[in-house]
């Protein structure tokens, strides 16, 4: 696989020598890296002014490479990049045909970071500092995106967001996570909260079997709401690096949410097993309806085999069974003579 290098880089193989500077490198280490790069590619300049100009371009290239590779490390890019002998050239100076097209998603992430900096008034003392901060920001962004995907799938009871502290490590975020105490609700506020709950129910299609069940669920919802509000208050004052929100699991207990996650995980595992079985036996179906029907039969066969093998483990059966290429067929469809004797 080749490492595609954006702007001032050409394609090089992953196995080639890749510069791996760390964001926290000191100025002396970066200078040493530049000198090593010059020797490697036989670089020399006619004046100190020219060298300073070329070093600035090299630093900009190095920064882009580091940012890209950080995204690649977080799974946001499908390839890595490296610094090569064109790293001190402008886009116009690089020979035509050697510049890859910019990736739209990469441009979008860069634009998002720049907008975030503007909104939050962020400036940095050096390109190295900005690269380090962007790396942390990207990691926070990836974590928030992953969390929110789980929230969309019902595996989390709240959503998260990016805020002012998203370029800081956990150690750098101001300490003192004090619980925010909310004032007792008066009649007007209580009516607003009741209205909010009713709107939430409509939004997520919630209905309950009895007034007792609704009262119970509302209590859980209120506790979730309080926790989210307290967290977001801390986020506003800089004690958290992300914000939270309500979703369709906000009326469930932690145990119920965890149980849902387990159920979702088990269903995903069984689905993966079915897909693997289809590939193994070359199974395809003419329609989604037919596949759904066959999967139901396969699931019933799988259940029967699993139960039988549990009995075999306990000494209640003298043999074990396995799922084979007939597992999506009914008893009538299996060729005669291939079914075990009763």
Swiss-Prot record:
It is found in: Cytoplasm; Vacuole. It comes from the Eukaryota. Residues 1-19 form the signal peptide. Glycans are attached at residues 153, 184. One of its GO terms (molecular function) is cysteine-type endopeptidase inhibitor activity. Transmembrane segments: none annotated. The keyword Signal applies. The keyword Glycoprotein applies. One of its GO terms (cellular component) is vacuole. Keywords: Cytoplasm, Glycoprotein, Protease inhibitor, Signal, Thiol protease inhibitor, Vacuole. N-glycosylated, with sialylated biantennary complex-type glycans. O-glycosylated, with sialylated oligosaccharides. Gene3D superfamilies: 1.10.287.2250. It holds the Pfam family Inhibitor_I29. Inhibits papain and ficin (cysteine proteinases) but not trypsin (a serine proteinase). This is Cystein proteinase inhibitor protein salarin.
């Amino acid at each position: 696989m080749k490492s595609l290098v954006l702007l001032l880089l050409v394609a090089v193989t992953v196995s080639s020598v890749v510069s791996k500077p760390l964001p926290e490198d000191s100025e002396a280490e970066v200078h040493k890296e530049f000198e090593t790069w010059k020797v490697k590619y036989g670089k020399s300049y006619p004046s100190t002014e020219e060298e300073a100009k070329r070093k600035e371009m090299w630093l900009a290239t190095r920064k882009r490479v580091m940012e890209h590779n950080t995204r690649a490390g977080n799974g946001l890019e499908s390839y890595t990049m490296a610094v090569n002998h064109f790293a001190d050239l402008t886009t116009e100076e690089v020979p035509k045909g050697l510049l890859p097209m910019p990736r739209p998603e990469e441009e979008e992430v860069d634009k998002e970071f720049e907008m975030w900096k503007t909104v939050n008034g962020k400036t940095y003392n050096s390109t190295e500092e900005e690269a380090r901060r962007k790396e942390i920001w990207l990691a926070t962004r990836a974590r928030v995106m992953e969390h929110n995907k789980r929230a969309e799938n019902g595996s989390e009871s709240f959503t998260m967001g990016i805020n002012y502290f998203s370029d800081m490590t956990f150690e750098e975020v101001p300490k003192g996570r004090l619980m925010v105490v909310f004032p007792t609700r008066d009649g007007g506020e209580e009516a607003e909260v009741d209205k909010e709950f009713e709107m939430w129910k409509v939004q997520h299609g919630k209905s309950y079997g009895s007034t007792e069940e609704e009262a119970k669920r509302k209590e859980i919802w209120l506790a979730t709401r309080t926790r989210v509000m307290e967290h977001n208050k801390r986020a506003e004052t800089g004690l958290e690096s992300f914000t939270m929100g309500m979703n369709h699991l906000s009326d469930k207990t932690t145990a119920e949410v965890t149980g849902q996650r387990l159920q979702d995980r088990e269903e995903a595992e069984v689905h993966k097993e079915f897909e693997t079985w289809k590939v193994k036996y070359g199974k395809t179906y003419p329609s989604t309806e037919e596949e759904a029907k066959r999967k139901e039969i396969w699931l019933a066969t799988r259940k029967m085999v699993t139960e039988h093998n549990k009995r075999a483990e306990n000494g209640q059966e003298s043999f074990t069974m396995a799922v084979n290429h007939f597992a999506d067929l009914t008893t009538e469809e299996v060729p005669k003579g291939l079914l075990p004797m009763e």
